[in-house]
A protein has these predicted regions:
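Catalytic/RNA-binding core of pseudouridine synthases
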Residues: 9-12, 59, 64-69, 73-78, ...
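Gly/Ser/Thr-rich phosphate-binding loops and adjoining beta-strand/alpha-helix segments
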Residues: 2-8, 20-52, 66-82, 135, ...
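Domain-scale detector for complete catalytic domains at protein termini or as standalone homologs
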Residues: 1-13, 20-24, 37-41, 58, ...
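Acyl activation and transfer enzymes in specialized metabolism, enriched
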Residues: 38-63, 175-194
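Helical lid/core segments from catalytic subdomains that handle acyl or acyl-like groups
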Residues: 90-145
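Histidine-centered acyl-transfer/condensation active-site motif
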Residues: 130-144, 159-196
Length: 205
């Protein structure tokens, strides 16, 4: 469910007054993750690496209250659920978006991931969940990337998690991940907590 809230009645009141009209309100943090356990769990459970990473992102985000509030134009909205947006390569060589509702059940999330992304790819038609707070993702696995900075626009204020190809060495597998968010939604400290919790979720797989 999505409802409008009065900014002054939330913990983001000061941030709303400071950053809502800023021409560049987005913040990007980058952290290098140890994804060794993620890769092993992916193979053990038969779940695609990116699907399992998206579930981990949802798991980490679901425990942080700032993820349930999002600015939109000159208003602030509160949500009671989270979904992950996937960029899908479609059958015509273009791309579409696909929203997948987060659930605590990783296997169920993976099933929906496979079903919905295949449907979107075949139909070349995006699928959106309007009543969920959307965490955007973008996996550019064609090459290794150190950092990704997304666009600054008032048309897309949602948090965005982005990564390239993971890197293997003798002892571990690492993956730099970039996280962009709107300063009205959260502060840098909240973003850092999310990245740390994401690593902890991965470590527990």
């Amino acid at each position: 469910m999505k409802i409008e809230v009065a900014p002054q009645e939330t913990t983001r009141a000061e941030a709303f007054s400071l950053w809502m009209t800023s021409p560049m309100p987005m913040v990007t943090l980058t952290k290098t993750f140890n994804v060794t356990k993620l890769l092993k769990a992916s193979k053990r459970c038969g779940i695609k690496f990116n699907a399992l990473l998206c579930w981990c992102i949802g798991k980490a985000a679901s425990n942080i209250k700032e993820f349930y509030i999002l600015p939109e134009k000159d208003k602030l909205f509160k949500y009671d659920s989270i979904a992950i947006n996937i960029i899908v390569n479609n059958s015509k060589g273009g791309i579409n978006s696909c929203d997948i509702a987060y659930t605590d059940d990783a296997e169920q999330f993976a099933k929906e991931y496979n079903r919905l992304t295949a449907q979107v790819a075949k139909q070349c038609k995006s699928s959106f969940l309007e009543d969920c707070m959307i965490v955007g993702t973008s996996a550019m696995i064609e090459t290794e990337l150190d950092c990704i900075v997304n666009q600054y626009t008032d048309k897309f204020c949602n948090p965005m998690v982005m990564w390239g190809r993971y890197r293997r060495n003798w002892l571990s597998t690492i993956l730099p991940i970039s996280f962009q968010f709107h300063h009205v939604q959260m502060d840098g400290g909240h973003g850092a907590v999310f990245l740390e919790q994401l690593q902890q979720v991965i470590n527990k797989l």
